[in-house]
């Protein structure tokens, strides 16, 4: 079980949003690279990064900040937000990114995801962001009619490294993970699932360490880490003991 600390980038700064609303951004660190190094020093082994501006623009906007992060940490980094073409994918992987996360393009052009998985095996994840049980795209600004499991099943056997499942209704508000929908997804597909959105407390961490959660590859934490609701050392200890 991997605990991924999150760095969400808006205008070059490390922020957290409430319910995916760009107008409800709290700045936590003006130096994302320093934050990345701090997470590494705390013992985390991965880093989850999202280019929020890029998610709306359809191309990387916070590239300078991402490059600084890659130079600041030795940890593997996965990046989502604005990655829509094979050229985008190749560009970031060539710069040292371990894994790209494809969200909107997974809905708009599933064939591109399949092609990317063949070209870059083990380095392509799919981000499924849901609101009210339906998949959202374009930086969560648009809702589709596609169900979460319906979309996920399109990529069975394609070589997708992981599915990062975000419940938008719980993101950034410390409401707790949507356990039912997350586990339903994990049970419906063979692709590893990473939970995102709502992780709120050490109680959630302890639940992640239970046998029923072994279907999950990990979980992403943002605001709970920044606000001190989750102690990094204790959380990592609990999850490693359950491995």
From Swiss-Prot:
Name of one Pfam family that matches: His_biosynth
Entry keyword set: Amino-acid biosynthesis, Cytoplasm, Histidine biosynthesis, Isomerase
Principal subcellular localisation of the protein: cytoplasm
Residues of the active site: 8, 129
Enzyme class: isomerase
Gene Ontology terms for molecular function: 1-(5-phosphoribosyl)-5-[(5-phosphoribosylamino)methylideneamino]imidazole-4-carboxamide isomerase activity
Pathway: Amino-acid biosynthesis; L-histidine biosynthesis; L-histidine from 5-phospho-alpha-D-ribose 1-diphosphate: step 4/9
Signal peptide residue numbers: none
Gene Ontology BP annotations: L-histidine biosynthetic process; L-tryptophan biosynthetic process
Annotated EC: 5.3.1.16
InterPro entries noted in UniProt: Aldolase_TIM, His_biosynth, HisA_bact_arch, Isoase_HisA-like, Isoase_HisA-like_bact, RibuloseP-bd_barrel
Subcellular localization, as worded in the UniProt entry: Cytoplasm
Family membership: Belongs to the HisA/HisF family.
Protein's name in the database: 1-(5-phosphoribosyl)-5-[(5-phosphoribosylamino)methylideneamino] imidazole-4-carboxamide isomerase
């Amino acid at each position: 079980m991997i605990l991924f600390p999150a760095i969400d980038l808006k205008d070059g700064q490390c922020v957290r949003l409430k319910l995916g609303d760009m107008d409800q951004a709290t700045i936590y660190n003006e130096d994302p690279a320093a934050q990345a190094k701090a997470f590494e020093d705390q013992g985390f082994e991965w880093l989850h990064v999202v280019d929020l501006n890029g998610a709306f623009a359809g191309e990387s906007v916070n590239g300078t900040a991402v490059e600084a992060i890659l130079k600041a940490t030795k940890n593997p980094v996965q990046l989502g937000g604005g990655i829509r073409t094979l050229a985008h994918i190749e560009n970031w992987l060539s710069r040292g990114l371990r894994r790209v996360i494809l969200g909107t393009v997974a809905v708009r052009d599933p064939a591109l995801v399949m092609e990317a998985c063949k070209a870059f095996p083990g380095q392509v994840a799919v981000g499924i962001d849901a609101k009210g049980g339906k998949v959202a795209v374009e930086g969560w600004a648009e809702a589709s009619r596609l169900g979460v499991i319906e979309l996920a099943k399109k990529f069975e056997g394609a070589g997708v490294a992981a599915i990062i499942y975000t419940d938008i209704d719980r993101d950034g508000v410390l409401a707790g993970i949507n356990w039912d929908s997350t586990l339903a997804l994990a049970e419906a597909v063979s692709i590893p699932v990473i939970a995102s959105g709502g992780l709120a407390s050490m109680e959630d961490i302890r639940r992640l360490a239970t046998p029923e959660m072994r279907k999950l590859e990990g979980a992403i934490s943002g605001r709970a880490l920044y606000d001190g609701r989750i102690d990094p050392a204790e959380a990592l200890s609990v999850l490693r003991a359950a491995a």
